[in-house]
């Protein structure tokens, strides 16, 4: 058994190369072979967001607190809130982050390929895309 103590975990500010605004991350687990699981709590200040990116094995987001946004390339922005789960299929270009006026945190879970490939990063999300009216919540 391995217990990863929270007191040994460091909060990291995420780089401007892949994020807009102030974004923090706490890595919860980085699996060792044969596991390929990676999980992090990511906290976004209002307006903070990822750049467009994709994951070869997909990604799952579990919303912990606040209000956020997520968008798949070519689809309408979706509002997401605490308790929501977002399942992102493999190789789907997307972004996620906080609403313009709310803090937002989620647990981000993904796996690497057996070759160690993880996140593929693309361009930053434009303010026009980010500020688009979200789809109605159903």
Which residues are covered by each model-predicted region?
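A short, N-terminal "cap"/entry segment at the start of jelly-roll beta-barrel domains
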Residues: 1-36, 118-138
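Short beta-strand His + acidic residue motifs that chelate non-heme Fe in jelly-roll/DSBH
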Residues: 50-53, 70-71, 79, 93-100
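Glycine- and acidic-residue-biased ligand/ion/polar-headgroup-sensing regions
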Residues: 56-69, 73-74
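Short acidic-glycine-tyrosine-enriched beta hairpin
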Residues: 74-91
């Amino acid at each position: 058994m391995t217990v990863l103590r929270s007191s040994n975990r460091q909060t990291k500010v995420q780089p401007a190369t892949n994020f807009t605004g102030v974004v923090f991350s706490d890595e919860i687990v980085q699996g060792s072979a044969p596991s390929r699981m990676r999980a992090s709590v990511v906290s976004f200040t209002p307006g903070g967001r990822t750049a467009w990116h994709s994951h070869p094995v997909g990604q799952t987001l579990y919303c912990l607190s606040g209000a956020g946004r997520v968008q798949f390339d070519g689809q309408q922005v979706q509002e997401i809130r605490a308790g929501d789960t977002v399942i992102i299929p493999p190789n789907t270009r997307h972004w996620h982050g906080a609403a313009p006026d709310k803090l937002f945190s989620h647990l981000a879970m993904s796996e690497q390929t057996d070759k160690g490939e993880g996140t593929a990063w693309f361009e930053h999300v434009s303010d026009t895309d980010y500020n688009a009216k979200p789809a109605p919540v159903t």
